[in-house]
């Protein structure tokens, strides 16, 4: 029987949990902060945006065409601005202002949904939120990559994605609990 070469920090039973936890704990504060911000941001986003179709149809009395316009404009905006912000950050090496503006647009814009009285108003708020995403995504990734050495980039990005995905799970759970409590 052939001998299996083990990866560093991987035990014979495949348990590398303690080594992985140690590696995660050693990540720089910047990576932890970006991860936490992403968790909170994604939680708030996933609390609201899955309810937009229902809000459009039952409160704003808009149809599927309005939803298509809103989401099409929003996602196209985010995609184009990611390219723009990436180019700007590569040239200037200043990522933090873009990240702050990007997350700030989301934080200030989302609560305004409560005051929207028409679907064009919702379009403006969703547009602003996606402008924020476009501004922050590439600079955030550049800051993450620059915060760790090449040997830790996979861990840093994996940790960030895990925190982001945790927010995507927490948000709908909180929204569901709030809806149940409010009925």
PLM feature spans:
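Helix-loop boundary and gating motifs at the non-cytosolic
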Residues: 21-75
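Small-residue-rich transmembrane alpha-helices and their cytosolic helix-loop interfaces
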Residues: 38, 71, 75, 103, ...
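Transmembrane alpha-helix termini and helix-breaking/packing motifs in multi-pass membrane transporters
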Residues: 54-59, 170-183
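Residue-level signature of mid-helix packing/kink "hotspots" within the transmembrane helices
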Residues: 75-83, 168-169
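Helix-to-loop junctions at the C-terminal end of transmembrane segments
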Residues: 81-93, 179
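Structural signature of the two symmetry-related core transmembrane helices
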Residues: 97-111
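Helix-loop junctions at membrane interfaces in 12-TM secondary transporters
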Residues: 112-125
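Cytoplasmic helix-loop-helix junction between adjacent transmembrane helices
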Residues: 125-166
């Amino acid at each position: 029987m052939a001998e299996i070469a083990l990866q560093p920090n991987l035990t014979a039973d495949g348990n590398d949990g303690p080594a992985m936890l140690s590696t995660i704990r050693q990540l720089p504060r910047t990576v932890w902060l970006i991860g936490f911000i992403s968790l909170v941001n994604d939680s708030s986003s996933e609390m609201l945006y899955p309810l937009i179709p229902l809000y459009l149809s039952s409160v704003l009395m808009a149809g599927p065409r309005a939803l298509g316009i809103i989401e099409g404009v929003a996602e196209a905006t985010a995609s184009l601005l990611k390219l723009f912000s990436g180019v700007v950050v590569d040239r200037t090496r200043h990522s933090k202002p873009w990240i702050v503006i990007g997350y700030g647009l989301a934080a200030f814009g989302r609560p305004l949904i409560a005051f929207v009285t028409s679907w064009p108003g919702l379009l403006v708020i969703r547009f602003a939120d996606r402008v924020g995403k476009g501004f922050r995504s590439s600079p955030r990734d550049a800051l993450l990559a620059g915060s760790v050495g090449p040997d830790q980039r996979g861990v840093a990005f994996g940790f960030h994605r895990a925190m982001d995905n945790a927010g995507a799970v927490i948000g709908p759970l909180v929204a569901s609990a709030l809806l149940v409590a409010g009925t």
